[in-house]
UniProtKB/Swiss-Prot annotation:
The protein, known as: Putative uncharacterized membrane protein YBR113W
Transmembrane segments: 34-54, 69-89, 120-140
Domain of life: Eukaryota
Cytoplasmic domain ranges by topology: 55-68, 141-160
Lineage: Eukaryota, Fungi, Dikarya, Ascomycota, Saccharomycotina
Length: 160
């Protein structure tokens, strides 16, 4: 019996089927990037925002205790990431359904207002996320320098 692709040799599906869908999703995102500029820019913006968040926020998790400001920022960034993922998935679904309509000869209506609104909301959410990351890093730097100056004053007072 010949082996079938994406199946175990005993005929069972793999335990994690989502891994088998990654290449299809990557190909679809490549097609979107080649033919449609708006979803490609949204995907690129999501990737940039995630990289910036990981680069700036993860070291702060290990250095500082989470306070109320950090928790507000954390929940805000989670909301922003959910908005971005929803808008990207909706735009990818709209793109794939439009391609299916063109394939079967039906008339497609292009980007719906819902998709355009979601992409615009994702751009605004990404802007808020980047600004809040910058605000958080500025706040932590100011707190560090303030603590350092206070410790220096205490040392000078003890020496005198």
């Amino acid at each position: 019996m010949p082996l079938r692709p994406c199946r175990h040799h005993q005929g069972f599906l793999p335990k994690k089927q989502w891994r088998a869908k990654f290449p299809q999703l990557i190909v679809l995102m490549g097609r979107v990037a080649a033919e449609e500029l708006l979803p490609a820019v949204a995907v690129a913006a999501v990737v940039v925002a995630v990289v910036v968040a990981v680069e700036r926020v993860v070291p702060l998790l290990f250095v500082h205790r989470p306070d109320s400001f950090f928790l507000i920022f954390f929940f805000q960034s989670c909301f922003v990431c959910c908005c971005c993922c929803c808008s990207c998935s909706t735009s990818l679904k709209a793109y794939s359904s439009e391609k299916e309509k063109q394939k079967y000869g039906k008339r497609g209506n292009g980007n719906t207002p819902l998709v355009q609104r979601l992409v615009t909301l994702s751009y605004l959410a990404l802007l808020i996320l980047v600004l809040s990351i910058e605000l958080l890093t500025w706040f932590v730097k100011k707190q560090r320098t303030g603590n350092k100056k206070q410790k220096d004053k205490e040392k000078n007072a003890l020496l005198l």
